[in-house]
Design a protein with these regions (language model features):
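Short proline/glycine- and acidic-rich turn/helix-capping motifs at secondary-structure junctions
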Residues: 76-85, 144-155
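Basic, often amphipathic N-terminal segments
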Residues: 1-70, 92-141, 154-162
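A structured binding-face within diverse protein domains that lines the active/interaction site
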Residues: 89
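Short, surface-exposed loop motifs enriched in S/T, G, D/E and P with embedded aromatic residues
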Residues: 70, 74-76
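Charge-rich, low-complexity N-terminal segments
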Residues: 84-86, 108-109
């Protein structure tokens, strides 16, 4: 399938997950449900791979997780990507986060973020005041790495950081 891909994602502790999901739920509560994938953990995408590399990527993920300590992140930003179709909350791009990303691929043009909504620009602009109202800077924790395949969504593996 040409549309299939693997996605390696940094996952959060329960408190961070709940906090981010709560902000996203406020969007759903006002009818802004978007086009993004539902029923997956809040996350930061680290890298994508072709599906043929599943075994290799799973082994790499397990090795990296065993060598990497869980770490804190500071969520301090709200953003919209060029084109106006993605609204996100972003942590500071600190050394721990960059180090984890670079274990999977270069971080030069990478924007670490957790997507709140993917939708048409007019809906993103409606969603922005909701996120602004609900969001204030907070500290969270990256505690795991997930491996998913997309289209259709399939959870492959979650490994806790040490």
């Amino acid at each position: 399938m040409e549309n299939k891909f693997l996605c390696v994602m940094a996952g959060y502790d329960d408190e961070t997950e709940k906090h981010l999901a709560g902000i996203q739920q406020k969007l759903y509560d006002v009818g802004l449900t978007g086009e993004h994938t539902k029923n997956i953990p809040q996350h930061i995408t680290l890298q994508t791979y072709p599906p043929e590399q599943e075994g290799e990527v799973a082994l790499m993920l397990e090795k990296i997780a065993a060598e990497t300590k869980a770490f804190d992140v500071c969520f301090a930003h709200i953003g919209i990507f060029t084109g106006g179709k993605v609204l996100f909350i972003a942590p500071d791009k600190d050394l721990d986060l960059i180090a984890l990303k670079e274990k999977f691929g270069p971080s030069f043009d990478w924007v670490p973020h957790t997507t709140m909504l993917i939708d048409e620009p007019e809906n993103i602009y409606q969603a922005l005041p909701v996120v602004v109202r609900e969001f204030s800077s907070f500290h969270g924790k990256v505690t795991s790495i997930h491996l998913y395949e997309f289209w259709p969504t399939r959870h492959i593996l979650t490994v806790n950081l040490r």
